[in-house]
């Protein structure tokens, strides 16, 4: 049974989130607190397995509380954030401080949105409960997701079984979820500006990916930006898929460009790693390197298999270094992986691939 605590200064939000946890056979609500100081008193009685945390609260802000939790008893924390530019920036800082995931505050009175919010909340809690927080590489720097139906990536992109044109450009595709913001920062900050162009899907709600890309851009030698439709993939550039849209790689003559598409959730996500990887298999073939990293579920496993079958080098982050060994595990089970590597070694694999 996953014991959950909610820390939010809004009584309405606490009530709505609490109601979303009712009747879940594997989740129990340990309690709610209106600010971090009340939360710490609550935790004296019993410590939760997962904490749902607001950022802006009286008496102690969420990031200060988060750092205190991580110092005293590292615990999976899911940030419950507002959809504002300022909220996004602070939320990304919270991820850097050790939080494992983001959910957006539910829009009250909108039944469809509440149902979507509940699905995302439960998914985040179950993933967080499996997270090995001690494995986070924390540097200490400071559209609603539609529900459920598990679509095949064919609903977003056409079949990839046709002949590949040749091009000399190299492309690196990275896919990750829970724990991935820390892992991506760890890898990308180790890469020189001369590295091959990189396309990334990190499971994250829309409105947050721009702030995440901006943060990475401030600490990486490579340029990092949120992808825009028709952006060219170039050496020295990292394109982060927008939250709420699928990102595909396409060939345009001798160039690679990205296309952003709406569409249903694929493998329960949008953006989907499967959609990106399958498009990379189609567009780049053996000129690509695919890396599936920490995260829960199976998104990306089939797409990595198609990359493998098209001659790409395919890597999976190993279990010992994953915060959640889910997506890499499923890819290994499918036979999609050339080899498993530790997080410490992923950057050098990308550098070696660039020099080939």
Curated annotation (Swiss-Prot):
This is Protein-glutamate methylesterase/protein-glutamine glutaminase 3. The modification 4-aspartylphosphate is found at residue 54. CDD domains: CheB_Rec (cd16432), REC_CheB-like (cd17541). Its EC number is 3.1.1.61, 3.5.1.44. It catalyses: [protein]-L-glutamate 5-O-methyl ester + H2O = L-glutamyl-[protein] + methanol + H(+); L-glutaminyl-[protein] + H2O = L-glutamyl-[protein] + NH4(+). Residues 3-120 form the Response regulatory domain. It is found in: Cytoplasm. PROSITE patterns: CHEB (PS50122), RESPONSE_REGULATORY (PS50110). The gene is cheB3. Residues 165-356 form the CheB-type methylesterase domain. SUPFAM superfamilies: CheY-like, Methylesterase CheB, C-terminal domain. Belongs to the CheB family. It is an enzyme of class 3 (hydrolase). It holds the Pfam family CheB_methylest. Gene3D superfamilies: 3.40.50.2300, Methylesterase CheB, C-terminal domain (3.40.50.180). One of its GO terms (molecular function) is protein-glutamate methylesterase activity. Phosphorylated by CheA. Phosphorylation of the N-terminal regulatory domain activates the methylesterase activity. GO terms for cellular component: cytoplasm. The active site is at residues 177, 203, 299. Keywords: Chemotaxis, Cytoplasm, Hydrolase, Phosphoprotein. Involved in chemotaxis. Part of a chemotaxis signal transduction system that modulates chemotaxis in response to various stimuli. Catalyzes the demethylation of specific methylglutamate residues introduced into the chemoreceptors (methyl-accepting chemotaxis proteins or MCP) by CheR. Also mediates the irreversible deamidation of specific glutamine residues to glutamic acid.
């Amino acid at each position: 049974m996953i014991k959950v605590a909610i820390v939010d200064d809004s009584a309405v939000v606490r009530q709505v989130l609490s109601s979303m946890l009712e009747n879940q056979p594997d989740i129990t609500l340990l309690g709610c607190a209106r600010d971090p100081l009340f939360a710490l008193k609550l935790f004296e009685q019993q410590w939760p397995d997962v904490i749902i945390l607001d950022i802006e609260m009286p008496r102690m802000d969420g990031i200060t509380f988060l750092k205190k939790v991580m110092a005293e008893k590292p615990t999976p924390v899911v940030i419950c954030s507002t959809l504002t530019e300022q909220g996004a920036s602070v939320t990304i800082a919270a991820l850097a401080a050790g939080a494992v995931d983001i959910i957006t505050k539910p829009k009250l009175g909108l039944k469809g949105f509440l149902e979507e919010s509940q699905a995302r909340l439960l998914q985040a809690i179950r993933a967080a409960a499996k997270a090995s927080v001690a494995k986070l590489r924390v540097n200490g720097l400071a559209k609603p997701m539609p529900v459920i139906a598990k679509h095949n990536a064919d609903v977003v992109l056409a079949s990839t079984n046709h002949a590949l044109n040749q091009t000399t450009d190299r492309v690196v595709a990275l896919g990750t979820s829970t724990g991935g913001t820390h892992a991506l920062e760890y890898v990308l900050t180790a890469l020189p500006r001369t590295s091959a162009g990189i396309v990334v899907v990190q499971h994250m709600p829309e409105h947050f990916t721009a702030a995440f890309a901006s943060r990475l851009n401030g600490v990486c030698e490579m340029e990092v930006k949120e992808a825009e439709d028709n952006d060219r993939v170039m050496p020295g550039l990292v394109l982060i898929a927008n939250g709420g849209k699928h990102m595909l790689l396409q060939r345009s003559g001798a160039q690679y460009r990205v296309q952003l598409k709406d569409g249903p959730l694929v493998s329960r996500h949008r953006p989907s790693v499967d959609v990106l990887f399958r498009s990379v298999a189609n567009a780049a073939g053996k000129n690509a390197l695919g890396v599936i990293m920490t995260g829960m579920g199976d998104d990306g496993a089939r797409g990595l298999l198609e990359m493998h079958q098209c001659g790409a080098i395919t890597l999976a982050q190993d279990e010992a270094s994953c915060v959640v060994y889910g997506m890499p595990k499923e890819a290994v089970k499918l036979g999609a992986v050339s080899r498993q590597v530790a997080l410490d070694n992923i950057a050098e694999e990308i550098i070696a691939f660039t020099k080939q």
